[in-house]
């Protein structure tokens, strides 16, 4: 019997406790729901943008995106990064906040008993403080910060993002009822979480929520028609009427004002229906785009009216036993799979709503048990009760994912998704997308954003469901969580070797290296010190310095240290050294120290441990000192002192560095041997998504690629990821982005796109860099 089966067997003979039940009265738990709740909530700490609070719990996160809003003269810092990227998308952010708050409203006692209530409130305050900034006047709301394409083409930690981050808004001249209505719901629901502990803050949130709802109601429109950059990522497919219902429902719950209930019920009549029927839609679920299903549940609970009960029952029946001969797909292992992209997110959203509805439902014991058991099964599947016997929550349970598609937790310093091989940080609590089909199959692959990305909306209802299961089954949050991570090696260092030498000189080749990730930080005032000893009565005026190749600034000295020991200084304050790319994380300088008298480098302090054969590969040079301003970051001085590196407490936003020209590498001719896979991953009425894989089957690397093909039908690409796409008629040209420009022999890269039209099958032929590809 599976863990879930055992749990259900125990539950079957009991009267199901209410959501407020003490954990001590519950049946035995299949999993430690206390730990899962604790870690799922911590994930939101890791997603924070802007200035972090003094009690920041994520040892590898620092301040980031401190210039957000400057382009429009506002402070738009704060909020949450959306997913594994760093755009702040307002619609899913507000949806996530609403779902988190809903869980807090219904499961306050569970949050308190588990010791997580303060963390819930901290995260809701953090995101709502951002919503307040983003709503500078009644009919203005900033709904996105960061350009999607610019953000996605770069792979690195949030603290050193090099790109500009434009702000986008809706207003009375170009409105977005969906965005404003959802943000109103977020602030109204959050006000309920703070009503007892901070009534003044709750009142402030309600003021903004009322203004935002009035804005949404008075000026109708889809936000993605105004914030057009969002169309490729969070287009408002369902329109705005669902958010007008949703926002009014939450304002009614928060205020008790019957006028909001009347608005919700009036707008409800305009919610979508199944094709060519008057039946409310039931073959989808609660999500960032469509909140109708949450309104079914909440209006049933608030009014008891049969039409809302019928709509909620029909929806949840489709997810469990089926309606009119159809139901959601199920995998052999029991996962309800609605869609290929983030399938566990949809199952968790439905599970949370099912638990809320089941707790309220009376007079229908069959459905009450059905919906409850469905929810327990789906959450337990994500926690590890599945054919793989593996958790889908990072840092929790058995065999959890270790390579989520998440830039900052990966910690690359070279702007490469593949480097390093392993993620440098554990993104505790993050729910990954999960299987893309109803087959229980999954691979922990960082490059697979469909199955392995994480997002704030993935965890929102999941966290609430965990709180509900903690209330019923109990569990023990970890007493020592979180523990500060230890760096995986030197974050900032100097590597050096002898570049050339002679009777009166030594030339050193040195790299100033920044691979920082605890947190990532930029060096903007770096300097290097090389210590040496004067020999045979040579005076300092007989020493000179020159440079052969220099990505830094001036080389000065010699400067007296003590006795016969002097040092030369290489000033790198003209450069930004940051873990932000292959030319950004490392600066090279080749400097020569020449004496017109005696010269013996063997007794020089900084010469120790440096390879002395000219042309040797540079290695760590522990006797060369690297400083950032007055703070030593690397190396020991001649007195034997090895100072403790001092992290920069507030990372400086990194402008795009201007690289010093370096020798141009010899280009490698692209291989003409290749193989292409073309897979349509999902379809809907009028649209589809596809994944394309390109494999280098030749013996030479492909450095820079352009893939060409022609559609068989009238398909048209609307947006793409991991590539740039242009189209003329049926002819499509796809070009690499920075992080996947090189395809080594025997390796593959992939990209995906969304299109309109009906897929007519895979293209008949492909070309790579103008030559036929199989």
Task: Identify the residue ranges that each predicted region occupies.
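Ser/Thr/Gly/Pro-rich low-complexity, disordered linker/stalk segments of secreted
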Residues: 639-671
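Low-complexity, acidic Ser/Thr/Pro/Gly-rich terminal tails and inter-domain linkers that flank the onset
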Residues: 474-505, 669-686
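Secretory targeting and sorting signals
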Residues: 1-24
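Short beta-strand elements of extracellular/lumenal beta-sandwich folds
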Residues: 496-497, 502-525, 529-533, 685-701
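A surface/secretory-pathway sequence property marking extracellular, secreted
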Residues: 534-574, 716-736, 751
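Aromatic (Trp/Tyr) and acidic
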Residues: 29-42, 46-103, 144-182, 186, ...
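Short, hydrophobic/aromatic beta-strand segments
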Residues: 518-529, 536-545, 700-708, 717-721
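Terminal connector regions
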Residues: 577-642, 750-774
């Amino acid at each position: 019997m599976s863990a879930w089966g055992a749990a259900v067997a125990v539950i079957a003979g009991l009267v199901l406790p209410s959501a407020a039940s003490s954990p001590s009265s519950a049946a035995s738990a299949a999993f430690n729901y206390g730990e899962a709740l604790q870690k799922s909530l911590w994930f939101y700490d890791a997603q924070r943008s802007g200035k972090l609070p003094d009690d920041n719990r994520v040892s590898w996160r620092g301040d980031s995106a401190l210039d957000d809003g400057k382009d429009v003269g506002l402070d738009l810092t704060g909020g949450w990064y959306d997913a594994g990227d760093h755009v702040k998308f307002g619609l899913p952010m507000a949806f996530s906040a609403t779902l988190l708050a809903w869980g807090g409203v219904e499961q306050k006692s569970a949050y308190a008993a588990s010791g997580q209530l303060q963390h819930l409130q901290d995260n809701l305050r953090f995101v709502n403080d951002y919503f307040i900034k983003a709503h500078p006047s009644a009919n203005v709301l900033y709904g996105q910060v960061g350009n999607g394409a610019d953000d996605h083409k770069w792979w690195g930690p949030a603290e050193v993002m090099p790109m500009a981050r434009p702000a986008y808004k809706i207003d009375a001249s170009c409105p977005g009822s969906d965005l404003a209505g959802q943000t109103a719901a977020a602030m109204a629901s959050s006000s309920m979480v703070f009503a007892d502990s901070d009534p003044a803050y709750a009142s402030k949130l309600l003021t903004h929520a009322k203004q935002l709802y009035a804005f949404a109601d008075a000026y109708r429109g889809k936000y993605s028609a105004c914030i057009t950059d969002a169309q490729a990522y969070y287009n408002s497919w369902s329109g705005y009427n669902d958010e007008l219902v949703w926002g009014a429902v939450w304002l009614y719950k928060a205020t008790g004002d019957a006028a909001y209930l009347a608005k919700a019920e009036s707008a409800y009549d305009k919610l979508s229906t199944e094709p060519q029927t008057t039946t409310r839609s039931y073959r989808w679920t609660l999500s960032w785009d469509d909140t109708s299903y949450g309104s079914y549940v909440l209006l049933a609970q608030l009014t008891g009216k049969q039409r809302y009960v019928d709509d909620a029952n029909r929806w949840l029946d489709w997810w469990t036993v089926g309606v009119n001969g159809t139901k959601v797909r199920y995998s052999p292992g029991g996962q309800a799979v609605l869609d290929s992209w983030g399938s566990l997110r949809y199952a968790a959203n439905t599970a949370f709503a099912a638990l809320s509805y089941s707790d309220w439902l009376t007079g229908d014991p069959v459905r009450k048990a059905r919906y409850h058991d469905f929810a327990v099964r789906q959450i337990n599947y994500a926690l590890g009760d599945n054919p793989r016997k593996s958790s889908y929550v990072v840092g929790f349970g058995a065999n959890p994912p270790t390579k989520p598609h998440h830039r900052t937790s990966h910690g690359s310093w070279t702007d490469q998704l593949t480097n390093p091989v392993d993620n440098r940080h554990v993104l505790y609590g993050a729910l990954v997308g999960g299987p893309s089909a109803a087959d229980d199959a999954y691979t922990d692959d960082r490059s697979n954003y469909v199955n392995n990305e994480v997002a704030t909306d993935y965890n929102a209802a999941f966290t609430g469901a965990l709180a509900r299961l903690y209330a019923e089954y109990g569990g023990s949050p970890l007493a020592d969580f979180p523990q500060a991570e230890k760096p995986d090696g030197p974050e900032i260092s100097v590597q050096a070797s002898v570049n050339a030498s002679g009777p009166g000189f030594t030339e050193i080749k040195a790299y100033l290296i920044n691979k920082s990730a605890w947190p990532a930080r930029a060096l903007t005032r770096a300097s290097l010190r090389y210590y040496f000893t004067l020999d045979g009565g040579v005076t300092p005026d007989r020493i000179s310095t020159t440079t052969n190749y220099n990505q830094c600034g001036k080389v000065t000295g010699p400067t007296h240290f003590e006795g016969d020991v002097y040092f030369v200084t290489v000033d790198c304050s003209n450069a930004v050294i940051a873990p932000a790319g292959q030319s950004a994380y490392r600066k090279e300088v080749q400097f020569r120290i020449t004496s017109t008298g005696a010269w013996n480098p063997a007794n020089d302090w900084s010469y120790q441990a440096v390879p002395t054969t000219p042309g040797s590969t540079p290695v760590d040079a522990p006797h060369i000192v690297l400083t950032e301003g007055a703070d030593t970051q690397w190396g020991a001085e001649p007195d034997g002192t090895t100072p403790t590196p001092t992290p920069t407490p507030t990372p400086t936003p990194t402008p795009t560095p201007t690289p010093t020209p370096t020798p141009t590498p010899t280009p490698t001719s692209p291989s003409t041997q290749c193989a292409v896979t073309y897979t349509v991953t999902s379809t809907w009425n009028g649209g589809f998504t596809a994944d394309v894989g390109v494999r280098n089957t030749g013996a030479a690397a492909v450095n820079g690629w352009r893939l060409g093909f022609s559609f068989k039908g009238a398909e048209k690409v609307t947006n793409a990821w991991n590539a740039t796409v242009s189209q003329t008629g049926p002819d499509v040209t796809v070009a690499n982005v920075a992080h996947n420009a090189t395809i080594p022999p025997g390796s593959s890269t992939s990209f995906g796109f969304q299109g309109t039209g009906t897929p007519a099958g895979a293209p008949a032929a492909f070309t790579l860099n103008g030559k036929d590809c199989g």
